[in-house]
From Swiss-Prot:
Keywords: FAD, Flavoprotein, Monooxygenase, Oxidoreductase, Ubiquinone biosynthesis. The gene is ubiM. One of its GO terms (biological process) is ubiquinone biosynthetic process. This is Ubiquinone hydroxylase UbiM. Its EC number is 1.14.13.-, 1.14.13.240, 1.14.99.60.
Amino acid sequence: MRLFTYPTPDLIHIKLKVKIRIHPPLHISSTAGFDIIAYLLQIVQTAFKPLQMPSEIIGIRLCKGYFMSLHSDILVVGAGPAGLSFAAELAGSGLKVTLIERSPLTVLQNPPYDGREIALTHFSREIMQRLGMWDKIPENEIYPLRDAKVLNGRSDYQLHFPQPTEARGEPADCLGYLISNHNIRRAAYEVVSQLDNVSILTDTVVKEVKTSDNEAQVILENGKILTARLLLAADSRFSQTRRQLGISSDMHDYSRTMFVCRMKHTLSNQHTAYECFHYGRTIALLPLEEHLTNTVITVDTDKINSVQNLSPEELAASVKEQLKGRLGDMELVSSIHHYPLVGMIAKRFYGKRSALIGDAAVGMHPVTAHGFNLGLSSADILAKLILEAEQRGQDIGASSLLEKYSNKHMLHAHPLYHGTNMMLKLFTNETAPAKLLRGLVLRAGNNFPPLKKLITKQLTG
């Protein structure tokens, strides 16, 4: 290990090691331990500043490959599924990535059940398999989605998307897969936690972000400053990072609230998903096990008491009644979680030395259950462009690269987001003309093969 001797401003000669090894292994977070480490780094930087040494070579390597430096190649604000997936894409690249997450480490290691089931396309499965995430999810908690049906109002007429025979040019026996959100988050963290080139700062709040022609800068709430060649916002559809970057967005408050829970039932769901646009409230059914279904109830926000005030037995009975006994007797078997519904799409997905991924770029209405697919796709597109640029010795934060990413992701995200909103506007409109049109749309979907094929392709990825 190299030693450097250099006079400090007060002319006292000191010896400083560039690398500091700490035992036992630590996970970096904004704790007192990190404060001490950061202080040591500041001493090193002060001592070596006259030598004009690059800040990125002054850092701390912890056991198990964790590396923390005041300078990284890429800073990612948000260690949710999109941020973690992006970091996993850069495994073995040599690029130093630092993720900044306000949640504690225990939440990343063991995310709590939040009621949300994610519908994954075949393309998303391919990405997750390549990144090593798929194999970390218990096989018995990956649920195939065979069929999908859409109902309208009080009618029993169904728009039916049957079990496919192929997807993405390969044989397939399902439209996609359903996996609990907390299982995806856990798998993503397990992959990233083993990467030598990735650091995760937990319990850490970002106060401010700045970008210039040469670098991006993140100022933490504790006063510390981190820099990088590129900054990514992956901190939810309500992203403060996006706002500070000056990237505007179209945000739509649907004025509705979604309740999610698991229910057992006496009749088989036949691995079929239902979207029931009934009058008054919408029910979505996502099949897990044959007699276990994730139940999503959506009501106008001013009517949430009509759900919240029900006992578990009353809620199960009301769902059974609304489904006309389609799944037999119902029983609530999980906690109930509720979320206000807000959609968002950014005007563009990049800024100066910065880009948006995941929900910070596009926050979909959960009616599609496909929000994570978009987030995963955004991470995949951007990571591939960055890896290509790095291999060619090009600037990974160049505006031309980031604009290319933005255009490519927008090409898919824009029509999906606005198309979903148009559908929701129609199927939550209960005027007489809208009710008539809703029925006609379902029939057109069943009897116009090109349209059905297009929607099926979207479902399968």
